[in-house]
UniProtKB/Swiss-Prot annotation:
Belongs to the RFT1 family. The keyword Signal does not apply. GO terms for biological process: dolichol-linked oligosaccharide biosynthetic process; glycolipid translocation; protein N-linked glycosylation. Its main location: endoplasmic reticulum. Keywords: Endoplasmic reticulum, Membrane, Sugar transport, Transmembrane, Transmembrane helix, Transport. This is Man(5)GlcNAc(2)-PP-dolichol translocation protein RFT1. It comes from Eremothecium gossypii (strain ATCC 10895 / CBS 109.51 / FGSC 9923 / NRRL Y-1056).
């Protein structure tokens, strides 16, 4: 276990690297499989698999996300030992980690029945569709069963194991998904050259997706359990079932820490509205868009946010884990460390956002042409992805700022943020109605609504962080955040020049030569950014080196 702020920072820096590697492996495997399948399947099938994925992710989010955040607030002894305190902390975490199954099992059934009744009859009558629903429910239960062991490894900051296990689970999912479709196309449906039964083909594709979900969940559960038996069970630090723990400073025992339980309730309320805003676009397209448009948006989410999920998501999650563990003891030193980390990460995000905004819209359509088959040529996906590129920086910046807010905010501040989420939910729905129903902007209108939503959330978190910074440095001459970003002015000017030159000479990329010119320009810009932040990069390299911290 880590005890000092610098040790937690060092391990979290390594953890971000492990999570990025795991995400990179998982996304590369998924990417290759996606490019094979997209040439066989229609936008309609991607629409229904997107719905099943939404069903699974929604149940898992509402079941476990608040618990994962709340257990990070369990106060540690700080000595890094393995005595009674360590055992009590882990048992408390495991007790909380048993709650997701109690929430998820009934929620999965209710949500599946409700959504099933609202589906188009075309899908409900597909071969194997009912079996696919049952398999998705099974995958949810299997994944929730692994939650106690996930929480234990999260509490110990065991990033390496998690990235290894999740990488293996993703690989298993993709292999099963591909194997089922490949088997059907080559052994049942001819050689894949002629579609003899397109209706059954679509049913098989949905079934393959569901089987992939089950393979992922079962692999994850098996790996966590085997690791527990091999490395933790013999030490008897905790039980996987509910066990009472002695309340600190008291002779009484309880299953749940009262402070953590109160924080869980407030975080859960906030996450309900946060998820509605984060996943609200999927709810909207299910109501206001055609099945083909749902498939297009699913494709955009998969291709358009590759960088976001491979780079930004691991950093955001590592920051959240790092800050929550670090600030379980809110010393002045720890507060200064967390502020320094945030400023450096915001700089990195701003640099990457500039690169995406400059080169994303001009290159994305050309690159996407090589990745999709003829079944998508008649859709608007090539035009829509250009607009989607402008949304990615807002999505990413909001993620890092809200991760900081969730880590440092008190229970009452989180509750106030929940009320804001409630208000923004109404604003989001209003914007969607205006853009989609009134102006008929289709998917572009949905993206504009998301940009407005993310902008408002960024403004709120930025104001909170600005106040937090002023209070933290009240006794110092440095009371403004702007001085930390003074070096960005030169890079911003360079970005404007590069964007003007790129658009004036090339515009939208149409051939390989123009693509190579854009790559050269982007590399030059990135090198200029790296030179501008050379001291920060050297510090990051030092932090990424292995530290003598024992990992379980």
């Amino acid at each position: 276990m880590c005890s000092t702020g610098e040790e937690i920072l060092a391990k979290s820096t390594q953890g971000a690297t492990f999570l990025m590697m795991g995400q990179l492996f998982g996304k590369l495997v998924t990417f290759v499989l996606h490019n094979v399948l997209v040439r066989f399947l229609s936008p309609r099938i991607f629409g229904i698999t997107s719905f099943l994925d939404f069903l699974s992710s929604t149940v898992l989010f509402f079941s476990r996300e608040a618990i994962r955040l709340a257990t990070l607030r369990i106060k540690t002894g700080g000595d890094g030992g393995r005595g009674g305190e360590m055992s009590a902390e882990l048992q408390t975490a495991v007790n909380f980690a048993n709650i997701p199954m109690c929430i998820g099992a009934p929620l999965a059934v209710v949500l599946a029945v409700w959504q099933y009744s609202n589906l188009n009859s075309y899908f409900t009558q597909l071969p194997f569709f009912s079996w696919s629903i049952y398999l998705v429910l099974l995958s949810i239960l299997a994944e929730l069963a692994s939650e106690p062991l996930y929480v234990v490894n999260q509490f110990m900051l065991n990033y390496r194991k998690r990235s290894q296990f999740e990488g293996a689970a993703v690989a298993a999912s993709c292999l099963v998904n591909f194997a089922v479709i490949y088997w059907y196309e080559n052994w049942v449906n001819g050689r894949g050259e002629t579609v003899h039964d397109s209706y059954k083909q679509e049913g098989i594709a949905v079934l393959a997706f569901a089987l992939g979900k089950v393979a992922r969940a079962m692999t994850l559960l098996a790996l966590y359990y085997v690791d527990y038996v091999r490395h933790l069970a013999h030490e008897k630090l905790f039980s996987l079932s509910l066990t009472k723990v002695r309340v600190p400073g008291s002779v009484y025992t309880a299953y749940f820490d009262s402070d953590v339980l109160q924080h869980f309730k407030k975080v859960y309320f906030q996450l309900c509205f946060k998820h509605l805003l984060t996943e609200g676009d999927k709810l909207i397209i299910n109501s206001l868009c055609t099945v083909e448009e749902q498939g297009i948006y699913s494709l955009l989410s998969n291709y358009g946010s590759l960088i976001t999920r491979m780079v930004f998501a691991p950093i955001e999650e590592s920051l959240l884990l790092f800050l929550t563990r670090l600030l379980s003891d809110k010393t002045q030193q720890n507060l200064h460390i967390c502020m320094r980390v945030l400023v450096n990460l915001v700089k990195f995000y701003l640099y990457l956002a500039l690169v995406i905004v400059i080169f994303g819209p001009t290159n994305s359509s050309f690159l996407l042409k090589f990745l999709i088959g003829s079944k998508w040529s008649s859709t608007s996906v090539l035009e829509t992805i250009r607009v989607y590129c402008f949304y990615l920086p807002f999505l990413s910046m909001n993620g890092i700022l809200e991760a900081f807010f969730a880590s440092v905010a008190s229970g009452d501040e989180i509750l106030r943020h929940s009320y804001l989420m409630m208000l923004l939910s109404g604003v989001f729905l209003l914007n969607c109605w205006v853009f989609l129903a009134h102006f008929n902007l289709s998917l572009e209108g949905l993206i504009f609504s998301n940009i407005i939503n993310m902008t408002l959330r960024i403004i709120y978190c930025s104001n909170y962080i600005r106040g937090f910074y002023k209070r933290l440095f009240a006794d110092s001459k440095q009371t403004s955040l702007s001085s930390s970003f003074a070096g960005l002015k030169k890079i911003l000017l360079l970005c404007i020049v590069v964007a003007y030159v790129d658009w004036s000479i090339i515009g939208y990329v149409q051939n390989i030569r123009q693509l190579l010119v854009n790559i050269l320009l982007s590399v030059t810009l990135v090198l200029a950014m790296a030179y501008n932040e050379r001291k920060l990069l050297l510090e990051f390299i030092k932090k990424s080196k292995p530290v003598p911290v024992k990992e379980n």
